[in-house]
Amino acid sequence: MPSRRGFLSLESERGVTARFALLSGLQEFAIWLPLPVLVLHMTDRGFDLAAIGFAFAVRAVLVVALEVPTGGLADAIGRRPIALVSQAATFLSFLLLLFALGPATLMLYAVFQGIGAALHSGALEAWYVDRLKALEYEVSLQKNLATIGVAQTAAMLAGAAIGGSLPALLSGSELPWPLSGFGIALFAGLVLRAFVMYLTIVLVEEPERRGTQRLAEALTTPAVVRDGLRLALRIPVMPYLLVAGAAMGVATISLETFWQPIASLTFGADPETSGVYGFLGFVLGASGLLGSLAVMRYGDRFPGGPAALAGASQVLKAGAMILLALHATGAGVAVGLGVAFFALATQNVPHDTLLNEAVPSERRSIMLSINSLVFFLGVALGSSVLGYVAAQQDPRLALCIGALFTLVTAVAYVGVALAARPRGKELVAEVSDEA
């Protein structure tokens, strides 16, 4: 398939970024359509916070088990086939959740979510970064990743606002089950996910491989995995980035799981009043967009570089989580959510920049998968332990614990700043030569 010229050309920085921004933005839109009411959909179907937390923990454990092998497979056989299988598994998971009535369906949702998440992490981002680095001129990775972040958070903003409002807007339409209640938001996300799979086939161009070639390359996966694990230990910045990634997992799952139950203490949890969740979804989406825009515009000028920016964002995020937990009024929820998601955006881009700059192209997917692995270890910890705390005590207490953990691990970025990156690149070459 010939590369498209003009706006989506693979021969220019703008074209490569536009292509990935379109794909990742629509994918983010599909994710966020159901997300503002996802936990409410589960509780509406009869699941309590302990069961929901357990399901999220199952998802995280599966990601932990599959993350590294599937990352190695993406490096071995190509990023597009892995991305497509990931999208299909995630599509099936939300289809199951749409029809969920009992624990078995909820667990199947968690299983396919875990498979999809494990396959997803790193594949398309690795394709994008490699395409950028293959250009004939030098580009700013942090600025381009921030541009992608803008596209993703703009899509998140639209998805959260629309998905959070759909149940209220259509509450008088007498939709059939399972579209009634909060189900309509999940259905809208499913439709968009199908379109994203089509776009992945069209936009993610890779060299054609025959079946025998794919099989031969798949057999190299164990060597790729071994190489990646050795790099994770020997590149100086990697241990610190992995600690920060785990903390990011705890914070993210705490926010995603507990903000809706905390908000429901003030606003209630009926589909007819879901418009407020659409507004809150707009707030968190707009805040994430502002964070990405701030990094795109000023990130390269932040004193201390990407490590300092990520560390400061971690501290800000912890403070916002505590604010959200301790001030569950309308204003407290909105401000806490807004600042927390602003800080998530301003942490993610420099973190990803540090990671991508530290690893070699031929091992990019496996290294991104290892980063995702520790992220989901944090998700597993946050889902299981904090889910139990939320069910037995209060979701506000669980969120405070997540915030304190986030605050403590902010020091990981101090280690990143002190690590000798030039020596890390020499070690990359040494380990690659030994493989």
Predicted ranges, named:
Residues 25, 93, 103-120, 246-247, ...:
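Hydrophobic core of transmembrane alpha-helices in multi-pass small-molecule transporters
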Residues 111-152:
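Cytoplasmic helix-loop-helix junction between adjacent transmembrane helices
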